[in-house]
């Protein structure tokens, strides 16, 4: 194990290039302090100076504010790495290797923040690095030395690979090898990413030999620029001219934007890097267990806030001021929660957060350093049987069918009109109480695609999954019938591109509610790829720009990246859903939704509930506008044209994001949608005067 002052600390690290959006490689003291503040806010405790020594001031600030530093020498020959002429083996380059490592050590020797020396980056193994290792060990016997390219050889004290698969990490952690495993680069944070970060930290917390790693990387390395139309963008490779070689947006792998705005995936990092963990003991009685993961400090500097939520609404709250938990110790605590049986039939959630009593290390009093959400009583799915609504002393009038129109099947009720296009069987009009709930020309259609993320492009999913982009739907049946006073419309389709059948069923009651069931029956084809998502898509007029939902938030989240986002009731707008990743891609999804409302200023609109928690997104952008196609285009989020309506996606599930790398990795199997049978039911209910 790596020991710091005798303790086997966990390295909750990030790689940091010196980069500023306005001044390039010149980083001011103010910007450095901003970076350290953000690291503290998100529980990052270590930084690797990739791939060169930083400004001396950076080490001084790390000394002052408390960050572990891996001090890396300016030795990189990536371009020669995959040839037979690796500079690490050339005698003519021996002096250059050694002198750069000597200067790195000599200039930073007296900085207590430096706990590890790094010989360099991606230059290959060989005698030149062996000489550097021997010199450093003779010069400084107190600090370990690491070098990724040395692998398991003697001239690295730490096994510090890059982007090691989960399984390979576990295999090493279970082996008889004696060197600690600390990845010098892992969890490639490119674009909408960091899915599966939990799986890394499950292993790190399970195996003492696996002590963490350094995320690649801290900040998106783009500069502020204006395109030919005068639109301000963050520029990346290829934006400056067409003739210089570039790696496109491969410089944008950050946890934060160039302007130091946390990217949505940063919140997941902050959660799994936290050092106070809460576990349920008997939540019915308010009993929890606290584990202090810190190695050098107790919890006396913090207080605990707790909240009890019933179906997402705050019903009780309290504070515990004294937390006497020693480093690496556990303690049980009983919170003053009333009888939970008084909230019968409601989903009960217990939120706890740990906050600073006083300001420290650039953080304000009351800042939350750790949190947890625990289920006291589980969520119960709603009754999905749709029947006519009986009004007091008024006989309900069943909806009727008008099949006389040549283009549309029309369903009418006392206060609504619903139309289905006869040519394809899709819902095409939804008017309730005089209000059009679907955009003119829009339809409710099956959807299996998303705008590929950077990781999707790296795994070539835009090619591999291409068959799911608007697969051919050949309508084979279109019927309607009355059933218990409701109208049932059914449409069947052949899907020859994917060897499947699709069935869409709509049950409509007397108030204009619609239960939609999307069912796919897979054929026996063996080579149909996974899907990006399974769900439906529709367009609503732009007046329905308000979002009110009970699910995970407030930031976007995905099936393999939603542990930092708590369940609750959130009130947002459509404009807030789009996150401007430097290159346009999938964004804005929320998961584990119990209900979702799309409302106008008056609080009227549509409410969606499903047979199980579902996913949704609402954007002023189409999927097509965020999709670069078969190959990445030279595009930037501010250049994408918004539409004048709300594009709404309601999904049973969506593919996870992955994080092992951005050049082939895809989400863990449990976060994928393999070819097979799927069924998804949800109810669309017109609502009025809902408080936003």
Where are these regions (language model features)?
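Extended substrate-binding grooves/exosites of carbohydrate-active enzymes
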Residues: 1-289, 294-300, 305-317
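Short acidic/polar inter-strand loop motif in beta-rich domains
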Residues: 354-362
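Short linear motifs in exposed loops
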Residues: 12-13, 226, 318, 334, ...
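Exposed beta-strand face motif in extracellular beta-rich ectodomains
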Residues: 346-350
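Extracellular and select intracellular beta-sandwich modules with Ser/Thr-enriched
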Residues: 316-318, 367-372
């Amino acid at each position: 194990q790596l020991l710091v002052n005798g303790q086997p600390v966990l390295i909750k690290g990030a790689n940091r290039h010196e980069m500023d959006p306005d001044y390039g490689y010149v980083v001011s003291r103010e910007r450095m302090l901003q970076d350290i503040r953000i690291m503290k806010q998100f529980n990052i405790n270590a930084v690797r100076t990739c791939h060169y020594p930083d400004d001396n001031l950076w080490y001084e600030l790390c000394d002052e504010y408390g960050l572990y530093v891996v001090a890396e020498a300016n030795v990189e020959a990536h371009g020669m790495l995959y040839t037979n002429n690796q500079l690490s083996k050339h005698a003519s380059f021996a002096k250059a290797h050694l002198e750069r490592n000597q200067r790195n050590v000599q200039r930073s020797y007296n900085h207590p923040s430096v706990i590890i020396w790094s010989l360099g980056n991606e230059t290959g193994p060989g005698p030149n690095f062996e000489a550097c290792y021997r010199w450093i060990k003779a010069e400084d016997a107190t600090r370990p030395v690491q070098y990724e390219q040395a692998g398991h050889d003697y001239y690295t004290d730490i096994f510090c690979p890059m982007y090691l698969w989960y399984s390979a990490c576990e295999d090493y952690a279970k082996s008889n090898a004696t060197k600690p495993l600390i990845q010098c680069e892992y969890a490639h944070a490119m674009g909408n990413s960091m899915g599966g970060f939990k799986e890394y930290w499950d292993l790190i917390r399970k195996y003492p030999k696996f002590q963490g790693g350094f995320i690649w990387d801290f900040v998106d390395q783009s500069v502020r620029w204006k395109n030919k139309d005068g639109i301000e963008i963050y520029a990346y490779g290829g934006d400056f001219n067409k003739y210089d070689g570039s790696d496109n947006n491969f410089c944008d792998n950050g946890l934060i934007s160039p302007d130091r705005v946390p990217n949505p995936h940063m919140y997941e990092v902050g959660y799994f890097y936290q050092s106070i963990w809460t576990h349920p003991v008997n939540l019915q009685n308010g009993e929890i267990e606290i584990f202090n993961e810190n190695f050098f400090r107790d919890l006396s500097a913090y207080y605990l806030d707790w909240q009890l939520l019933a179906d997402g609404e705050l019903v009780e709250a309290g504070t515990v001021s004294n937390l006497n938990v020693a480093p690496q110790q556990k303690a049980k605590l009983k919170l003053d929660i009333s009888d939970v049986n008084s909230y019968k039939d409601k989903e009960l959630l217990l939120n706890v957060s740990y906050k600073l009593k006083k300001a420290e290390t650039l953080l304000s009093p009351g800042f939350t350093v750790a949190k947890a959400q625990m289920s006291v009583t589980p969520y119960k799915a709603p009754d999905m049987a749709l029947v006519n609504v009986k009004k007091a002393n008024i006989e309900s009038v069943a909806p009727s069918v008008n099949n006389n129109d040549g283009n549309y099947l029309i369903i009418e009720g006392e206060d609504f009109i619903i139309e289905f296009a006869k040519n394809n069987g899709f819902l095409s009009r939804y008017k309730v109480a005089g209000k059009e709930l679907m955009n003119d020309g829009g339809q409710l259609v099956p959807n299996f695609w998303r705008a590929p993320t950077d990781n999707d492009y790296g795994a070539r999913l835009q090619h591999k999954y291409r068959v799911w982009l608007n697969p051919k739907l050949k309508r084979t049946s279109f019927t309607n019938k009355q059933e218990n006073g409701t109208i049932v419309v059914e449409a069947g389709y052949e899907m020859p591109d994917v060897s499947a059948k699709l069935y869409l069923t709509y049950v409509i009651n007397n108030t204009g509610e619609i239960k939609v069931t999307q069912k796919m029956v897979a054929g026996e084809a063996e080579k149909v790829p996974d899907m990006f998502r399974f769900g439906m898509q529709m367009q609503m007029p732009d007046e329905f720009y308000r979002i009110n939902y009970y699910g995970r938030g407030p930031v976007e989240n995905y099936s393999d990246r939603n542990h930092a986002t708590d369940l609750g009731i959130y009130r947002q707008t459509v404009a807030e859903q789009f996150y401007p990743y430097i290159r346009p891609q999938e964004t804005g999804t929320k998961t584990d939704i119990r209900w979702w409302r799309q409302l106008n200023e008056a609080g009227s609109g549509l409410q969606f509930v499903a047979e199980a928690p579902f996913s949704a997104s609402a954007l002023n952008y189409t999927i097509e506008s965020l999709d670069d196609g078969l190959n990445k285009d030279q595009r930037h989020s501010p250049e994408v044209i918004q539409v004048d309506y709300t594009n709404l996606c309601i999904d049973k599930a969506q593919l996870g994001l992955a994080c092992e790398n951005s050049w082939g990795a895809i989400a863990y199997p449990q976060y994928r949608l393999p070819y097979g049978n799927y069924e998804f039911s949800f109810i669309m209910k017109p609502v009025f005067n809902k408080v936003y």
